[in-house]
Amino acid sequence: MKSTEFHPVHYDAHGRLRLPLLFWLVLLLQARTWVLFVIAGASREQGTALLNLFYPDHDNFWLGLIPGIPAVLAFLLSGRRATFPRTWRVLYFLLLLAQVVLLCWQPWLWLNGESVSGIGLALVVADIVALIWLLTNRRLRACFYEVKE
């Protein structure tokens, strides 16, 4: 059932709220290590050099894949969110938790001796903005808690 809280263009043909465009960008931000992994795998010759450029310490690369798991699951389940409503609701909290982990990750690396860089600062700012958006966007929360009638 369509709610009058949101504009009609925010609904698809089945009467479900469409996920906001910014949601997909936040998922890409959260799954950034996964994206790098796919790009490195696709570019066979330069894959190792690319991974070494962004992750000189290979342990950080493998640990960086962990907070991206909820984002990858959200990509995969977004088309089937009506089929798996409980999983979809839990995924919202996992995305929030992953965003907090990613927000703390970079400063933790800095405290452990990694040099501060422009890319690191940009990622921290982007993580702060993403967390605020995930917490405050009413349409996004409504997408995760749609009521079936």
Curated annotation (Swiss-Prot):
Membrane topology, Cytoplasmic segments: 1-18, 80-89, 137-149
Stretches in topological domain Periplasmic: 40-58, 111-115
A GO cellular-component term linked to this record: plasma membrane
Claim: Nucleotide-binding is one of the keywords in the record: no
Superkingdom field: Bacteria
The name this protein goes by in its record: Inner membrane protein YfeZ
Localization, UniProt: Cell inner membrane
Membrane topology reported for the UniProt record: Multi-pass membrane protein
Encoding gene, per UniProt annotation: yfeZ
Keywords for the protein's UniProt record, in alphabetical order: Cell inner membrane, Cell membrane, Membrane, Transmembrane, Transmembrane helix
Natural source organism: Escherichia coli (strain K12)
Alphabetized InterPro entries for the sequence: DUF2919 (IPR021318)
TM stretches of this protein: 19-39, 59-79, 90-110, 116-136
A Pfam family per the record: DUF2919
Lineage: Bacteria, Pseudomonadati, Pseudomonadota, Gammaproteobacteria, Enterobacterales
